[in-house]
Amino acid sequence: MKVKKISAANVEACSLPKLFDEEKIDFQPIQCVNWAEYPYKPKVSFRIAHTQNSILLHFKVKEESVRAKYGEDNGSVWTDSCVEFFSIPAGDGIYYNIECNCIGTILVGAGPVRNNREHAPKEVTALVQRWSSLGNQPFAERIGETDWEVALIIPVSYTHLRAHETSLHL
């Protein structure tokens, strides 16, 4: 997949859907479910682009129900309705994952394997701009088909979690 580089100064996360439309960046469907013990497969698609300094993501989700229990970063957002982005920006085997629930609360982790990952401090998570179509306040499970979207602007400096500079290679 080719990831488009765009020139967008001072773009806000809430403007990403419109910007991606203007730049004609298509949605890509997510077709796999990685956990046999969790076979539920909501309809999910995403768009991605980058600037010189940021990764831009826009997710669209359709689910049978939706929940946003966690409102503080680095909480258990994976138990909420959420999406996830993985990258290995420095090519050093350290991968970063950013999990984002349906209200824009994130968990940022880094490490070579799934377990014992280092979580980003609040100073790093605060750098990630977010927008959610469902707002940003936690809520209990809402039963019934729900469409939601989140947009993230992730500065390349989020890899400072590991205290090193990197360049974006997409």
Spans of features found by a protein language model:
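Conserved small/polar residues in nucleotide/adenosyl-binding loops
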Residues: 159-166
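Beta-strand-connecting loop/turn residues
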Residues: 53-55, 103, 146
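Order/disorder boundary and secretion-linked terminal/linker segments
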Residues: 1-69
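Beta-strand-rich interaction surfaces with strong enrichment in secreted/lumenal proteins
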Residues: 45-46, 136-142
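Localized edge beta-strand/strand-to-loop motifs within extracellular or lumenal beta-rich domains
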Residues: 148-158
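Extracellular/luminal beta-rich ligand-recognition
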Residues: 72-138
